[in-house]
């Protein structure tokens, strides 16, 4: 029987982590106390809230909890603390590269405007990277619940700061709302500015939303993408083009996309040759971080250490990390497997 190696020592890249959702529960409680914010009971119970976002009511509840947590981030020091702690958690889980996703419009009103908010976030990322040794970059994400013109503004802003650590442009929130093609111009602006396109798709809706991300937004990565498993032709397309899917198993179960961890189609994607980068999504709400996603692959899908190492390689290759960083992480993965 193969020896089960420590998954926290497996070098990996983390490509799907939302900004507010990365917060430690203890930090949320401290910030809520600092600002006198009364949090919903679901955020103070000491265990992950029970969520099911497969209908609009469930998604509204999820969003309400997220907004409550975000309301506790009010000052630059709060931003710096969140980013530093996210980096510390990732390092603890074996990550050597983190691309954290943020919609700065959510923080701009309290941080002096959009540009100050972006600069505070980027400065926090630089500081956290220096302090922890973790390679870190930022994806700016538009909100599909807002007007496409807002997304274009964000895309231009993201391109403006591409030399300061912004590497990609995303599209998040309830994929059942709006059409991907409404945001095609924003993604064109981002791509023309050298940013990778990483919209959400194939989570709450089926394979069609993944196709829309490919056809309308020319995605180079897909946030989630698991529902592509329902369409063999789409799987082949993803595999042929080596489009990385940022798969978040614990999140998929918590939000009701799948009933059990073993129902998440990790094997289907893996055996079809679709690259995956396992991600934690929103640890604050789902109760698990990066290494736990690899543990799900091991425990519920019988991934061997050789296969887990390949998953880690796929996460690195799908990242925006520079070549030298990728080479170092890939060598570390080989050492984890053979050492």
Swiss-Prot record:
GO terms for biological process: nucleotide metabolic process; purine ribonucleoside monophosphate biosynthetic process. Pfam families: A_deaminase. The active site is at 203 (proton donor). Transmembrane segments: none annotated. Substrate binds at residues 18, 282. Binds 1 zinc ion per subunit. Gene3D superfamilies: Metal-dependent hydrolases (3.20.20.140). The record marks 224 as: Important for catalytic activity. Zn(2+) binds at residues 16, 18, 200, 281. Keywords: Hydrolase, Metal-binding, Nucleotide metabolism, Zinc. GO terms for molecular function: deaminase activity; hydrolase activity, acting on carbon-nitrogen (but not peptide) bonds, in cyclic amidines; metal ion binding. It comes from the Bacteria. Its EC number is 3.5.4.-. Its cofactor is Zn(2+). PROSITE patterns: A_DEAMINASE (PS00485). Belongs to the metallo-dependent hydrolases superfamily. Adenosine and AMP deaminases family. NCBIfam families: aden_deam (TIGR01430), PRK09358.1-5 (NF006849). Putative nucleoside deaminase. May catalyze the hydrolytic deamination of adenosine or some similar substrate and play a role in purine metabolism. This is Putative adenosine/adenine deaminase.
């Amino acid at each position: 029987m193969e020896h089960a190696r420590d998954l926290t020592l497996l070098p990996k890249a983390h490509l799907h982590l939302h900004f507010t959702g990365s917060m430690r529960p203890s930090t949320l409680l401290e910030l809520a106390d600092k600002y006198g914010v009364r949090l919903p009971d679901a955020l103070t119970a000491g265990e992950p809230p029970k969520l099911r976002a497969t209908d609009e009511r469930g998604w509204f509840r999820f969003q309400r909890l997220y907004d409550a947590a975000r309301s506790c981030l009010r000052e630059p020091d709060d931003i710096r603390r969140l980013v530093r702690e996210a980096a510390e958690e990732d390092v603890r889980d074996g990550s050597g590269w983190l691309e954290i996703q943020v919609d700065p419009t959510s923080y701009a009103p309290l941080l002096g405007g959009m540009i100050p908010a972006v600069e505070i976030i980027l400065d926090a990322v630089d500081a956290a990277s220096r302090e922890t040794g973790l390679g870190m970059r930022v994806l700016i994400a538009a909100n599909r619940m807002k007007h496409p013109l807002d997304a274009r503004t964000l895309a231009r802003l993201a391109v403006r700061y591409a030399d300061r650590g912004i590497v990609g442009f995303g599209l998040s929130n309830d994929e059942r709302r709006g059409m991907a093609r409404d945001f095609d111009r924003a993604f064109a602006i981002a791509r023309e500015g050298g940013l990778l396109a990483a919209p959400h798709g194939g989570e709450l809706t089926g394979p069609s939303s993944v196709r829309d991300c490919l056809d309308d937004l020319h995605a180079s990565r897909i946030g989630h993408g698991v529902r592509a498993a329902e369409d063999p032709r789409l799987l082949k397309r993803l595999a042929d083009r080596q489009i990385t899917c940022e798969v978040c198993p614990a999140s998929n179960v918590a939000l009701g996309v799948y009933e059990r961890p073993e129902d998440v189609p990790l094997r289907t994607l893996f055996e079809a040759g679709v690259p995956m980068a396992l991600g934690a999504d929103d640890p604050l709400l789902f109760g698990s971080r990066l290494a736990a996603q690899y543990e799900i692959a091991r425990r519920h899908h019988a991934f061997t250490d050789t296969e887990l190492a390949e998953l880690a390689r796929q996460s690195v290759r799908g990242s925006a990390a520079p070549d030298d960083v990728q080479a170092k992480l890939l060598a570390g993965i080989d050492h984890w497997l053979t050492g």
